[in-house]
Amino acid sequence: MVYAQADGIVNQDSSDVTMRLNGAAMGKVIDSGSCGKNVNYELYDDYTLRIFGKGTMYNYDWSWSSSDNELYPNVPWVSWISKIKSVVIEDGVTRIGSCAFMNCSSLTDVNIPNSVKSIGSDAFYACSSLKKINIPNSVTSIGANAFFECTSLVEVNIQDGIVTIAEGAFCNCSSLKQIDIPNSVTSIGESAFNGCSSLTEIIIPDAVTSIGDGAFANCDNLEYVKIGKGVTTIYDCVFLLYHTNPNVKTVIEFTAETPVTLASVVYFDQVYNNNAFADPENVIIRVPETMLDYYRNSEDWSRYKDSFSGYSSTDPTGISSVDNGQSATKADAVYDLQGRRVTEMLPDRIYIVNGKKVVNKFRD
């Protein structure tokens, strides 16, 4: 039996090769080959897929199977995709190819090194067992549908460096509870986080200048969204939310002290420009006090004119007075001074109740 280090390639019959990564045996090689001009792969009998070499992986496409109504990537390890449990991408690989790990339904662990600069479209499409992903600061772009329908994905760590999050990148990641969008991001594509129904808070940094249609649609448990100063246009259905609980409201906070416009959409010769936030009753839209009259009198925003409230630059909470002695029940829609939904109600604090009152006491 032949042992090899992780940075070496052993040209032996795959049935006789056992790989060691950081001193630990990974198992016997059961498949191997090329997946890039200077990039190779090895699959071990513990279903760890190792990608190694220098440069980019090939971009692959996919095929649809009518027999089981499934998509299958045209990758050399396609016969193993339902069994692959771990993917180890070694330093030197600069791009994760399109459809590379599509439908690897047993995949739970992925290592992305600092050499990777981009993640291709559909790269981890429907990896339904993947729970966590760390994206290093070397990555500047996440391709379309890269993590589409990774339904078990709870945690995504994206480091500063990423510039573009493409359309559908995290669409239907229904278990995703938190996403920290780095300050380096300038563009969020259409439906990028559509259907991320476990998200409760989104902070969009000032560097973002473009948010595509439906980017956060159907994130029906969103409670707080802060939109940075770089966003000047809100496109159709960006925050189209349908709350099943009528007591839940989403607080949308604009930070720009210049007008944010609603883009128009033409559909069957009909012009629409007021579907950004679904029903006005579901949202509280907080804007700088200097912009409040603009929004309330704007024809574009007329559907939401009663949803707006203002805050001053010296009072970031937007609250200039407190109605002492008011109270709220636990059934009320209660928010803290940052506009975030309160789930644990503490005594002798100041809160926003149903978007109208400010209180400092609770009663059961």
What would you call each of these model-derived segments?
Residues 4-6, 23-27:
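Boundary at the C-terminal end of the N-terminal hydrophobic targeting segment
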Residues 97-102, 120-125, 143-148, 166-171, ...:
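Consensus positions within tandem repeat domains that build extended binding/scaffold surfaces
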Residues 2, 48-54, 81-95, 105-118, ...:
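Structural signature of tandem-repeat unit edges
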Residues 2-4, 16, 349-353:
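Short, aromatic- and glycine-rich surface loops/edge beta-strands on solvent-exposed regions
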Residues 20-22, 312-338:
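Residue-level detector of functionally pivotal "anchor" positions at catalytic/ligand-binding pockets or at interdomain
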Residues 34-95:
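LRR flanking "cap" motifs
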